[in-house]
A protein has these predicted regions:
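Substrate-binding pocket helix/loop in short-chain dehydrogenase/reductase
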Residues: 14-16, 23-28, 117
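Alpha-helical segment proximal to the catalytic Tyr-Lys
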Residues: 44, 89-90, 159
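Short C-terminal tail/terminal secondary-structure segment
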Residues: 10-13, 158, 162-176
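Residue(s) in the substrate-gating loop at a strand-loop-helix junction
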Residues: 60
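Short, small/polar-rich loop/turn modules that mediate ligand/substrate recognition or access, typified
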Residues: 92, 97, 161-163
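Active-site helix of classical SDR
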Residues: 39, 76, 84
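Active-site loop immediately N-terminal to the catalytic Tyr-X3-Lys motif
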Residues: 16-17, 65-71, 93, 138, ...
Length: 176
């Protein structure tokens, strides 16, 4: 009776003029199309849930605040967000709640190798530790933080909420 849509890829930064059709379509296939398939195929199961169905969609900080070099990723996450919002409207009558989380960078995942972290921090003239905490609260957001929020969103606290979009980013100045 719960589904977390977390399928996604973040390709290396590429400006629009350098983005190939193959790269664009791959990102859309993973970040959008696969999640549409999962939603569609699980609808009967979610609808039959004893109490109510729950879906949490992993969006991105890039929906409200995209960055240069992330056109395919940002567009795919924006489209996924709209898909989730429409599903919340359409499936509410089936007692299915659909909400989204929009994390900023979560550094304890496989995407963020020590080399990538060092490069990004150097690009902004920061240490790696400062880069990880580059938000209003000066706190690193971890995969555990995101998982705990998702667990809450599948619980009683969110039983009467659908279509919500919750940032988990330590307070991103570009989003606030």
């Amino acid at each position: 009776d719960m589904l977390v849509l977390n399928a996604g890829v973040f390709p290396g930064g590429k400006k629009i003029e350098a983005l190939t059709d193959e790269e664009w379509h791959r990102v859309m296939a993973v970040n959008l199309d696969s999640n549409l398939t999962l939603l569609r195929e699980t609808h009967p199961l979610l609808k039959a849930a004893p109490k109510y169905g729950r879906v949490v969609v992993i969006g991105s900080k890039n929906v409200p605040a995209p960055g240069p070099g992330a056109a395919a990723y940002s567009a795919s996450k924006a489209a996924l967000t709209q898909l989730a919002r429409v599903a919340a409207l359409e499936w509410g009558a089936d007692a299915i709640r659909i909400n989204l989380v929009h994390p900023n960078a979560v550094f304890d995942t496989g995407i963020w190798t020590p080399e990538v972290l060092a490069q990004r921090a150097a690009h902004y003239g920061m240490t790696v530790d400062d880069y990880k905490r580059n938000n209003v609260l000066h706190e690193e957001v971890t995969s555990r933080d995101v998982a705990e929020l998702i667990a809450e969103m599948c619980g009683a606290l969110f039983a009467k909420i659908t279509g919500a979009q919750i940032p988990i980013d330590g307070g991103n100045e570009r989003v606030i």
